[in-house]
């Protein structure tokens, strides 16, 4: 099996159908597979019968994004894993061969970070009008809506962490890949259309759910991976207190909920502690950050 396309989904059946219909047009089921995990959503289960070529995993109780990915990725058989959000699909012509070519010509390549083209477009041709151009570069992270990782590299790591929820699992996998000595490449030449309503997101403003989970997972990230996490944690907590907790009562309340929860869960999180090499942290500092659309 050449490529496994992997999608975790919840509460977005209509978006998932669009993604699966797009994928079906570009895959060859003799060498490609599509695996979808439904993370505790009865409404999405209703479309399973319409896609018998998909390898479905159905969880009756939600476990959140990162643990769900950890479950799903263990089932993939392809030499290359392509991770997609349920509302994202490839735009690049000859996408599959292009992904394979990148890995075949660079043995040290662990992850390819695709260019994210955000927005709702009438056609893929319209979406391609918004593609940016530039030189590929080695980076520190990848965007979860569209990326590729070699199966052998993924299996050499601990995979997506079960001790995280959502928002933050990509940096955890990325730092483990870097610590193994592999590269993460951002390329403008492989694009995915992330079909989000950018205007609506801007109008929605504050995102309390994201704030809570990002802060929680960032604390855990430093506790697990950094050799000396105290300074990083102080900076993280001060930044979030100053920039969020002091500006809004709901942020303030969530901030302290996360802090006290982190203290209570400290013994269980430290069981996963796996500090990376100092050379990995230095590499992170010197590399160019990923480009977010």
Q: Residues of each region from the PLM?
A:
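Acidic donor-binding segment of Leloir-type glycosyltransferases
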Residues: 20-59
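Non-catalytic, C-terminal membrane-associated alpha-helical segments of glycosyltransferases
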Residues: 228-293
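Catalytic core of nucleotide-sugar-dependent glycosyltransferases
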Residues: 192, 202-232, 253-268
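A recurrent flexible, glycine/aromatic-enriched loop bordering the glycosyltransferase active site
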Residues: 118-119, 132-149, 165-166, 171, ...
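Conserved donor NDP-sugar-binding/catalytic core segment of glycosyltransferases
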Residues: 89-124
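Glycine-rich, basic loop-to-helix element that forms the pyrophosphate-binding segment
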Residues: 60-76
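A short, conserved alpha-helix in the catalytic core of glycosyltransferases
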Residues: 149, 153-158, 163-191, 198
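Short aromatic/hydrophobic "clamp" motif used to bind/position activated sugar donors
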Residues: 81
